[in-house]
UniProtKB/Swiss-Prot annotation:
UniProt cross-references to SMART domains, sorted A to Z: ZnF_C2H2
Organism per entry: Homo sapiens
Gene giving rise to this polypeptide: ZNF826P
Cellular localisation: Nucleus
GO MF entry, a single one: zinc ion binding
Record-linked SUPFAM superfamilies: beta-beta-alpha zinc fingers
Protein name (record): Putative zinc finger protein 826
Keyword Ligase: no
C2H2-type zinc-finger residues: 99-114, 120-142, 148-170
Presence of the UniProt keyword Transcription regulation in the record: yes
Length: 177
């Protein structure tokens, strides 16, 4: 990790030996990493659910790898600890039925399904959508454009989903019920 930080920012290496112990919560760890400008590791775990203090984390890590528990607070093991934290969060969220996401923008997009927020509006008719890609596809209704054209029979479609269903006719594939 020292070499990695040296390659990215030589001024941070001299501070590696002086790092304070890891904070007590994951929120604190995230803040801890942000304060030290470790941009490469701050996004390792961005959970919706934050577990109990590091006592549980130490127990979790011990169950998986007993050699890492004694080193949890050492700066050289922060990155590996964060990987264990990510695994801990994903497992905990799955147990509690909490949805987790790969991309940082995904929770915000997913929230729209619950709030009913539809920020993308058609200028022609005012119909609103949750995603800009859906609006782009919808706009073809007003223009008369049918971007999906079958090369075998020449039939054209506004929606890619309709086109994909149509392709099954030519392939002989049975429809999905």
């Amino acid at each position: 990790m020292r070499r990695f930080i040296l390659e990215r920012n030589p001024t941070n290496v001299k501070n590696m030996a002086k790092l304070s112990p890891i904070p007590h919560t994951l929120l604190g760890i995230r803040k801890f990493m942000l304060e030290r400008n470790h941009t490469s590791v701050i996004n390792v775990a961005q959970p919706l659910f934050y577990p109990q203090p590091l006592v549980n984390m130490r127990r979790f890590i011990l169950e998986r790898n007993s050699t890492n528990v004694k080193n949890v607070a050492k700066p050289s093991t922060i990155f590996h600890t964060l990987l264990y934290i990510r695994q801990f969060i994903l497992e905990r969220n799955a147990i509690n039925g909490i949805k987790t996401f790969t991309w940082s923008s995904s929770p915000h997009k997913h929230r729209r399904t619950h709030t009913g927020e539809k920020p993308y509006k058609c200028e022609e008719c005012g119909k609103a959508f949750t995603a800009s890609s859906t609006l782009s596809e919808y706009k073809t209704i007003h223009t008369g454009e049918k971007p999906c054209k079958c090369e075998e029979c020449g039939k054209a479609f506004n929606w890619s989903s309709d086109f994909n269903k149509h392709k099954r006719i030519h392939s002989g594939q049975k429809p999905i019920l």
